[in-house]
Regions:
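Sec/Tat signal peptide C-region and signal peptidase I cleavage site
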Residues: 5-7, 15-24
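N-terminal secretory signal peptides that target proteins for export/translocation
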Residues: 1-3
Length: 135
């Protein structure tokens, strides 16, 4: 039997999903790195949504909205004033927010069968809300 490296298997799997029948699972994966940039707003509507946002700057702001079967978001913010908002609707939802600065505000809202959310804040002023609902 011929050996196929792990990277080749991942490529074949991705190709199979991309060129499969109309009922194949759709995937949307985004990684955003922002240094002193404008606010990040990301909307994802695939069956599998994954987002990673890493921000450094005086004032950071990120909003991620995901509607799909499986949703995962990680936001890391290092700034003076940090703001993060994650909205997820799907069967399985995972959200993580990490913030360090003078003030940190975050909101995580999840509607699904299995919801996991965590907020870690290291700031002088911290405000966080996690709302999880199962249908």
């Amino acid at each position: 039997m011929k050996y196929i490296p792990g990277v080749a298997w991942v490529a074949l799997l991705a190709l199979g999903c991309a060129t499969g029948p109309a009922g194949a699972q759709s995937v949307d994966i985004k990684t955003i790195v922002s240094v002193g940039g404008p606010p990040v707003v990301l909307n994802q509507n695939s069956q599998l949504n994954m987002a990673g946002v890493f921000m450094i700057g005086g004032s950071t702001s990120a909003t991620v909205t995901q509607n799909g079967t499986n949703n995962a978001t990680g936001i890391l913010q290092f700034g003076g004033t940090n703001s993060a908002s994650i909205g997820q609707a799907g069967m399985n939802n995972f959200a993580f927010v990490g913030q360090t600065g003078q003030s940190a505000t975050s909101l995580v809202s999840q509607l699904g069968t299995m919801n996991t959310g965590a907020v870690v804040q290291f700031s002088a002023v911290n405000n966080s809300t996690i709302v999880q609902n199962a249908p």
